[in-house]
């Protein structure tokens, strides 16, 4: 019976008293029963904003009462206690669920800290639930800081737990101003995101543009096509409601700002040193830009008739208008960078013979992966890189009415949407996993569906037939099995489920890898990527490499970051300090007080062209945001 607001329940065979309104977790803790939980762990939703799919889900228990079915599994942090409730916290079923849910959290952890060194924040929970190892661990590839002679800081190991700050403060008595903002830390190029958002909130887009340009020469490009890893780590999205639209706020000053940032921009006197850069993509052009500002003579060799690399021939104009890309490349050229087009480089010896003291290779990853099925070289089958290059250069491409695309990444989505704009009546993407596992950006997938692209999930190609100009693609249905090396569940064919799709053109978009000319005489590693040292130097003296040719296919912002790092390393190699730091706007006073953070504020509304209008041409689909929406969004 309920007495004085107290009720009786049973936890693991022991009767305890609890107050009405308490959760099972609160009641258990009051009675000194341990139920693992990570309510306030970085990256997980804290109470009371907890959403089951976004919480740690480690505090699961089996509960039984008049409202909960016999033995039903519930989250103890949100389930209230009731009279005569029976709770079990450690059954085999509960332990298995806890191990599975803990794995989902640990996949972001550095493996050697938790399981080899057995020294991490989650060690007690790991031991308690009986987790022995992470079957598939996907390490992050973030830069290490080697500038300090006393320690090496590897950002790949950082989970923003603030443990290092507590140790310095509590044990060594060394305080810090504050930990790095997660969004700032997540930006590969190190753009000061909180600062430019603060400036936009104050109605200063010119200053915001200057802050962005302190780290990247492509604000307009990145404001449109950056995958925005910073938004995944946005503190507001993790702790309050929804992430700030960081990418769109980057585009706003690029669209509305002026050239006042140039007043503080400086180019150092000539050093008399010459550098050759092979590839005019984001990595090569970024490297050239910063080396030129350091006073070096920089020449970029580009095999294509247009500069920009995959920004020019890989990303369609409806996502990245040509005038935006062209204007930002022209700004790079104004620093003294020379770009030679239709200039393919097959040997590095010839460049050294021309007097270049250093070479930076930024040749991308353009060799396309094979489907590995019979008939994939049949007429009517085209590789995605070739297809997009021809489409984006305005060449004539005959594709017919029925087009199929194999793949689930951004390149597959771009290929499908480009096919619609070439007049295809039916475009189908065939992907071997579900939409949840698609690596393509979610907004790109949504826009493709709006435009009429069909996506068929859980299917994979098994054979291609081509006869009398008729193309048939045999597909087999799949089911998801155990996780593979990417951390995603491996698709497994279902026997006897083969079916045929009739097509006019099949576009293969399952991935690319670097194509390294033999004449370069350089060591390569897994995936045919160039092997480099920490400073991006290769196995050959004076030769550096970065971007997709070193990392494999990655984001534009990663390539820009590689270009920055290469410029620093090459300058040091040539006797400089490697300092590419710029201060294009005076420091402003930051807010030093804490305010209540309102929840539920609406996200900035982004306008798009109507789907039927999109596919009739190459007009930009995403229209950006204006003053009326940018400032309130920045103020969230």
Which positions does each model-derived feature cover?
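Glycine-rich dinucleotide-binding loop and its adjacent helix/turn
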Residues: 253-269, 327-342, 368-422, 524-541
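Mid-to-C-terminal Rossmann-like scaffold of FAD/NAD(P)H-dependent oxidoreductases
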Residues: 446-452, 460-467, 471, 479-481, ...
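Feature captures the FAD/FMN-dependent oxidoreductase FAD-binding
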Residues: 200, 207, 269, 274-278, ...
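A conserved FAD-binding loop/helix module that cradles the flavin
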Residues: 415, 549-577
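Glycine-rich Rossmann-fold phosphate-binding loop(s) that bind the pyrophosphate
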Residues: 279-282, 408-409, 548
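FAD-site-proximal beta/loop scaffold in flavoenzymes
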Residues: 377-400, 483-553, 557, 561, ...
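Rossmann-like dinucleotide-binding cores of NAD(P)H-dependent redox enzymes
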Residues: 297-340, 391, 416-463, 578-593
């Amino acid at each position: 019976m309920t007495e004085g607001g107290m009720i009786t329940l049973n936890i693991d065979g022991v009767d305890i008293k609890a107050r009405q309104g308490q959760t099972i977790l609160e009641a258990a803790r009051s009675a000194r029963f341990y139920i693992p939980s990570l309510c306030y762990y970085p990256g997980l939703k804290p109470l009371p904003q907890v959403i089951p799919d976004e919480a740690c889900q480690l505090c699961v228990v089996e509960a039984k009462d008049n409202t909960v079915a016999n033995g039903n599994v519930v989250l103890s942090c949100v389930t209230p206690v009731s009279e005569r409730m029976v709770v079990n916290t450690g059954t085999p079923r509960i332990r298995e669920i806890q191990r599975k849910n803990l794995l989902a959290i640990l996949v972001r952890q550095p493996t050697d800290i938790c399981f080899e060194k057995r020294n991490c924040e989650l060690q007690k929970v790991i031991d308690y639930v009986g987790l022995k190892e992470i079957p598939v661990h996907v390490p992050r590839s973030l830069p290490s800081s080697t500038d300090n002679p006393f320690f090496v800081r590897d950002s790949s190991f950082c989970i923003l737990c603030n443990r290092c700050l507590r140790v310095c403060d509590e044990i060594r008595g060394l305080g810090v101003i504050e930990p790095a903002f997660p969004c700032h830390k997540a930006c590969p190029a190190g753009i000061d995101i909180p600062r430019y958002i603060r400036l936009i909130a104050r109605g200063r887009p010119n200053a915001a543009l200057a802050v962005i340009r302190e780290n990247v020469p492509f604000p307009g490009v990145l404001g449109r096509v950056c995958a925005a890893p910073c938004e995944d780590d946005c503190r507001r999205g993790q702790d309050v409601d929804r992430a700030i639209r960081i990418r769109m706020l980057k585009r706003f000053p690029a669209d509305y700002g002026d050239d006042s940032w140039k007043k503080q921009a400086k180019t150092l006197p000539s050093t008399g040193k010459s550098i050759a850069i092979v590839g005019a993509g984001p990595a090569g052009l970024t490297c050239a830009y910063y080396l030129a500002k350091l006073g070096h003579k920089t020449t970029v060799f580009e095999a294509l008739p247009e500069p920009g690399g995959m920004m020019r021939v890989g990303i369609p104009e409806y996502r990245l208008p040509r005038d935006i890309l062209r204007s930002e490349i022209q700004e790079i050229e104004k620093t003294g960078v020379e770009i030679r087009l239709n200039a393919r480089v097959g040997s590095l010896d010839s460049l050294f013979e021309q007097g270049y003291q250093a070479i930076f290779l930024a040749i991308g990853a353009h060799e396309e992966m094979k489907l590995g099925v019979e008939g994939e070289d049949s007429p009517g089958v085209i590789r995605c890189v070739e297809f997009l290059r021809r489409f984006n250069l305005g060449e004539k491409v005959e594709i017919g009415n029925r087009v199929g695309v194999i793949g689930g990444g951004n390149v597959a989505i771009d290929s499908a949407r480009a096919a619609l704009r070439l007049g295809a009546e039916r475009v189908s993407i065939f992907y071997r996993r579900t939409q949840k596992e698609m690596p393509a950006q979610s907004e790109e997938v949504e826009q493709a569906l709006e435009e009429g692209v069909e996506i068929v999930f859980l299917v994979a190609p098994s054979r291609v037939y081509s006869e009398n100009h008729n193309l048939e693609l045999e597909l087999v249905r799949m089911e998801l099995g155990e996780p593979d090396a990417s951390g995603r569940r491996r698709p497994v064919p279902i026997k006897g489920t083969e079916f045929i799709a009739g097509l006019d053109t099949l576009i293969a978009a399952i991935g690319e890898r670097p194509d390294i000319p033999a004449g370069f005489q350089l060591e390569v590693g897994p995936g045919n990527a160039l092997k480099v040292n920490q400073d991006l130097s290769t196995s050959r003296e004076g030769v550096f490499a970065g971007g997709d040719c070193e990392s494999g296919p990655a984001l534009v912002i990663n390539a820009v970051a590689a270009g920055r790092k290469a410029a620093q390393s090459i300058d040091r190699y040539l006797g400089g300090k490697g300092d590419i730091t710029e201060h294009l706007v005076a420091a402003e006073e930051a807010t030093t007080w804490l305010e209540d953070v309102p929840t539920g504020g609406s996200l900035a509304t982004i306008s798009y062209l109507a789907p039927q209008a999109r596919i009739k041409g190459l007009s930009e689909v995403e229209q950006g945001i204006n003053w009326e929406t940018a400032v309130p969004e920045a103020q969230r």
